[in-house]
C-alpha cells in the first residue's frame, strides 16, 4: 500500500487546511484501504498522515459520538482483531444511526456485481439508518445506504452517480 504524495498535498491544501481554518470538526473512520494490515486498524494512513490536525478525530474502533442532538455509532473496518469489540459496541449502543466502513452481503459493489459474502445486515436491525462507505456504487435497501465514492476511480465506476452527501442531523 502506498500514498500518492501529490494527492496528499492537494488534500491537505484544499481540504484539511481549509476546514481547520474554518473551525470545522472532522470525524473520520479507518477503512480497509487506510489500514495497513488486514487484521488490525492500529497502523493506518489517516492517523499517521492527519494527526497534525487538532480538528480531525480519527476512529479505529467502534465509537458512539454525538453531533448536535444525534447519537451516531461510528464503525470502522471490521477485522479479526476488533470484531468482538465491534459486536459488543453494536449491542450496547443506544444510537439510532450508524456510519461505517462496512462490507454487507447482498449489495452492489459496482455495476454488474453483487457481494455474495460479508456481514449480515440483520446485525444492524436495531438501528433506524445505516450509512456506509466501502462499495463504490450507491445503493440501498431502504435502511442501509451505501454512499458510493465521490468521483470515478476505475472504469467500472464510469457513468455511476457521483458526488458528496450532506447529512442533516435534525431530520
Where are these regions (language model features)?
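Active-site-proximal beta-strand elements of phosphoester/diester hydrolases
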Residues: 69-78, 97-101, 145-148
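Residues at the starts of beta-strands that form the adenosine-phosphate
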Residues: 25, 71, 95, 128, ...
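Divalent metal-coordination and catalytic microenvironments
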Residues: 11, 31, 72, 101, ...
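Conserved beta-sheet core of the metallophosphoesterase superfamily
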Residues: 110-170
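Short, glycine/charged-enriched secondary-structure capping and boundary segments
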Residues: 5-8, 41-45, 87-89, 111-115, ...
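Active-site-proximal segments of metal-dependent phosphoesterases and phosphodiesterases across multiple
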Residues: 8, 79-88, 93-127
Amino acid at each position: 500500500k502506498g500514498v500518492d504524495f501529490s494527492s496528499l498535498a492537494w488534500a491537505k491544501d484544499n481540504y484539511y487546511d481549509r476546514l481547520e481554518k474554518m473551525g470545522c470538526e472532522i470525524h473520520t473512520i479507518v477503512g480497509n484501504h487506510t489500514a495497513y494490515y488486514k487484521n488490525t486498524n492500529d497502523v493506518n494512513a489517516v492517523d499517521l498522515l492527519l494527526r497534525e490536525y487538532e480538528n480531525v478525530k480519527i476512529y479505529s474502533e467502534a465509537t458512539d459520538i454525538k453531533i448536535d442532538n444525534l447519537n451516531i455509532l461510528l464503525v470502522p473496518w471490521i477485522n479479526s482483531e476488533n470484531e468482538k469489540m465491534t459486536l459488543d459496541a453494536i449491542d450496547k449502543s443506544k444510537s439510532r444511526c450508524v456510519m461505517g466502513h462496512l462490507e454487507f452481503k447482498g449489495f452492489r459493489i459496482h455495476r454488474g456485481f453483487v457481494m455474495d459474502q460479508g456481514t449480515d445486515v440483520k446485525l444492524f436491525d436495531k438501528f433506524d439508518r445505516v450509512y456506509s462507505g466501502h462499495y463504490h456504487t450507491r445503493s440501498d435497501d431502504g435502511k442501509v445506504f451505501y454512499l458510493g465514492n465521490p468521483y470515478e476511480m476505475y472504469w467500472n465506476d464510469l457513468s455511476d452517480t457521483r458526488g458528496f452527501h450532506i447529512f442533516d442531523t435534525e431530520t
